[in-house]
């Protein structure tokens, strides 16, 4: 075995799903799941995470550099990226850091239907119903990276559960993973999130004066002792993700048709993705 092959083998053995980072939150391999046709989603190339602002220790950065990430797709708004920049990524010029330019206020307004105009929180149930519409630009960025084999890739937002969870689910569904397993993967975020790590050392009370995302975070308890992430389901126990996938089925019939219609993928693109990211 060559030195490079040995290093890759050791790296692969260093984690099962969650990367052992000192200051990571919900940072995990999004692959390595079986598909309904007997294949398996590739491991070691598709990663997902919550905010990576707190990743700055030498040990964390040295570990992550071993993966030789080619792309980071940041799903966050302008305000989120301004408040909590991906510092280690921005310092690594070998990584293609891509994002869509939009305001957190757009996200909040897209979830406000049926809510009070003065409500400063995101209506989670409403937001999941429109994710397949509001996240189209970000989904295009992610799938472009996959089609151009700009991997390993990290897909992330602030908590690594809602926007990231939805787009990861769309990919897994396209690759042939069962919905039951997709929901299991989605629900992992409740236990794998580390809210205190995500919050970092930021003075949210001060930042809220000029940053809408900081103000939003205060409404969720930022600046107070952090709690575990909340379960990602309705009061009836239904995963919020099901609302988003059902919306795709209602509007398009299938994830594949959705990706062709809204994201612009061709049948050849889809075949290429399945061949490249499953085995």
Predicted regions and their residues:
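Ser/Thr-glycine-rich phosphate-binding loops at phosphate-binding pockets of nucleotides
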Residues: 159-164
């Amino acid at each position: 075995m060559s030195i490079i092959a040995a290093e890759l083998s050791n790296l692969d053995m260093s984690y099962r799903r969650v990367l052992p980072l000192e200051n990571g939150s919900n940072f995990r391999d999004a692959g390595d799941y079986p598909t309904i046709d007997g294949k398996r989603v590739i491991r070691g190339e598709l990663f997902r995470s919550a905010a990576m602002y707190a990743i700055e220790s030498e040990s964390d950065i040295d570990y992550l550099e071993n993966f030789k990430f080619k792309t980071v797709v940041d799903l966050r708004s302008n305000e989120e990226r301004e408040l909590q920049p991906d510092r280690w990524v921005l310092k690594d010029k070998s990584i293609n850091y891509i994002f869509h330019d939009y305001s957190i206020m757009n996200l909040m307004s897209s979830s406000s239907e049926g809510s009070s105009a003065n409500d400063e929180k995101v209506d989670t149930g409403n937001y999941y119903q429109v994710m397949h519409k509001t996240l189209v630009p970000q989904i295009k960025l992610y799938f472009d990276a996959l089609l151009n084999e700009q991997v390993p890739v990290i897909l992330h937002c602030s908590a690594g559960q809602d926007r990231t969870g939805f787009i990861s689910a769309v990919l897994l569904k396209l690759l042939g993973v069962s919905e039951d397993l997709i929901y299991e993967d989605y629900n992992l975020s409740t236990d794998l999130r580390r809210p205190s790590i995500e919050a970092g050392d930021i003075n949210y009370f001060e930042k809220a004066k000029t940053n809408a995302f900081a103000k939003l975070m205060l409404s969720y308890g930022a600046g107070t002792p952090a709690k575990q992430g909340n379960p990602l389901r309705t009061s009836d126990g239904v995963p919020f993700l099901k609302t988003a996938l059902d919306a795709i089925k209602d509007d398009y019939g299938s994830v594949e048709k959705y990706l062709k219609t809204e994201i612009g993928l061709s049948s050849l693109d889809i075949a290429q993705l399945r061949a490249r990211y499953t085995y």
